[in-house]
């Protein structure tokens, strides 16, 4: 079992029990799991960590759990998130001059619209995507207050956005992939969504050991190895991948990765 994302049968094999026994365990214990449609999926790393620590709560990857968390923190998300990276990511993206007035941009895991609102004046339109209705409500409220009229919202799972292939000129995932069970799936979806010649823009933490941050912000991943992420982008089909570092308030390290389709 070398692969990271496991089926029910593979997870049961990892535990060394029958599928029937594993289903019973799944019902009675807080086994880290995620339900996609009718199918259960399990992170191998999360299962091993859960087994060794005995604490599954911080590894809970259920879609409902994540949605509930972000719905709850939506009104204070701006204050909470800015305490970690302030305006540095938005300012860096503007400084990099990668957007233009002809672009339609999709912002995945947009939250309260930190990036969507920040780049709105630079592009034709932003489609802001998030699973949390409360986050999108905050975005619309703040956009209206600022007189922003070219940001549309879409409440859906970012791994399976209901849009046609090659729909947008650029797709962003700002401080979002560390919330995902399988970032590679998300990167492949980004490749599907963006037009040939378009760009994907990701910002995220480098690998860190700040468990307090992980638990407070409901993170799944404690940052990423930049070279590993570059491999994921290349495997999805992206090319011309470039990385720049950004300063953050906690000195963990944030990178911005830009890739061409």
Question: PLM features: residue spans?
Answer:
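Polyanion-binding surface elements
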Residues: 1-21
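Major-groove DNA-recognition helix of helix-turn-helix-type DNA-binding domains
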Residues: 16-40
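A short, Lys/Arg-enriched interface patch at domain edges and termini
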Residues: 45-65
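Conserved class I S-adenosyl-L-methionine
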Residues: 60-100, 114-115, 138, 145, ...
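C-terminal alpha-helical "lid/dimerization" subdomain adjacent to the S-adenosyl-L-methionine
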Residues: 78-81, 201-258
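Class I SAM-dependent methyltransferase SAM/SAH-binding core
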Residues: 106, 112-160
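A conserved beta-strand element that flanks and buttresses the S-adenosyl-L-methionine
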Residues: 172
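A short glycine-rich, Lys/Arg-flanked "PGG" loop and its adjoining helix->strand segment in the class I
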Residues: 184-199
């Amino acid at each position: 079992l070398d692969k990271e994302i496991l089926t029910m049968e593979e997870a049961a094999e990892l535990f060394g029990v029958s599928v029937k026994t594993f289903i019973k365990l799944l019902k009675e214990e807080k086994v880290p799991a995620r339900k996609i449609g009718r199918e259960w999926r399990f992170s191998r790393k999360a299962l091993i960590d859960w087994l060794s620590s005995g604490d599954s709560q911080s590894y809970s990857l259920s879609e409902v759990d994540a949605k509930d968390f972000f719905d709850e923190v939506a009104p204070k998300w701006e204050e909470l998130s800015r305490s970690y990276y302030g305006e540095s990511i938005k300012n860096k993206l503007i400084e990099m001059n990668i957007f233009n007035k002809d672009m339609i941009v999709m912002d995945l895991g947009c939250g309260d619209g930190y990036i969507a609102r920040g780049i709105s004046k630079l592009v034709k339109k932003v489609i802001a995507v998030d699973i949390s209705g409360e986050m999108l409500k905050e975005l619309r409220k703040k956009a209206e207050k600022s007189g922003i009229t070219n940001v549309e919202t879409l409440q859906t799972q970012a791994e399976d956005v209901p849009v046609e292939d090659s729909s947008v000129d650029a797709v962003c995932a700002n401080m979002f992939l560390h919330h995902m069970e399988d970032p590679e799936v998300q990167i492949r979806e980004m490749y599907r969504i963006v037009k040939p010649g378009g760009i994907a823009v990701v910002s995220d933490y480098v690998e860190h050991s700040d468990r307090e941050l992980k638990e407070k912000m409901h993170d799944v991943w404690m940052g990423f190895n930049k070279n590993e992420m570059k491999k994921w982008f290349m495997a999805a089909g992206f090319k011309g991948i470039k990385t720049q570092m950004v300063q953050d308030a906690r000195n963990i390290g944030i990178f911005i990765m830009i890739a061409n389709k």
